[in-house]
Curated annotation (Swiss-Prot):
Compartments in which it is found: Plastid, Chloroplast
Function (record text): This protein binds specifically to 23S rRNA. The globular domain of the protein is located near the polypeptide exit tunnel on the outside of the subunit, while an extended beta-hairpin is found that lines the wall of the exit tunnel in the center of the 70S ribosome.
Any one Pfam family match given in the protein's UniProt record, by short name: Ribosomal_L22
Domain of life: Eukaryota
Cited InterPro entries: Ribosomal_uL22, Ribosomal_uL22_bac/chlpt-type, Ribosomal_uL22_bac/org-type, Ribosomal_uL22_CS, Ribosomal_uL22_sf
HAMAP family: Ribosomal_uL22_B
Record's keyword terms, sorted: Chloroplast, Plastid, Ribonucleoprotein, Ribosomal protein, RNA-binding, rRNA-binding
Name of the gene this protein is made from: rpl22
Native source species: Aethionema grandiflorum (Persian stone-cress)
GO biological process entries: translation
Complex and partners: Part of the 50S ribosomal subunit.
GO terms for MF: rRNA binding; structural constituent of ribosome
Protein name, entry field: Large ribosomal subunit protein uL22c
Amino acid sequence: MIKKKKKKSYTSVYALGQYISMSTHKARRVIDQIRGRSYEEALMILELMPYRGCYPIFKLVYSAAANASHNKGFKETNLVISKAEVNQGNTVKKLKPRARGRSYPIKRPTCHITIVLEDISFYQQYEEYLMYLKNPGCRNEKRNLPCYETYSSGGPWDKK
């Protein structure tokens, strides 16, 4: 089996729940509703959905946010669920005793759920910095050179 190398990310945290006794299909039905949403919105959705699989996923999202605030110092208002995936786990097999000395097998499916939260405040600051860098003549008012848009047509470098 090939293992993926995890890149060290400075803006994301994750929580992993393993061997949760739930079918992967039922867990994916809930996970698809919260993927890409903000942390607070996801908690509200999970509290109001009527499925049994919401509670373990709610605990995982809450745990990932606690990891973000405790380990990296992120604010919970800036967190977004960037990645949420459900993988199939082991199937727990039991025997149910029946009449006349017989037994029926019972299969309990399990799943592994991974929730990744990202801090979007870093990206907003990065976009502001890029906007600041796009107009190089405008950031120094001491210069006497005119400020041209770098991507506009009709600038001094467009002439042949």
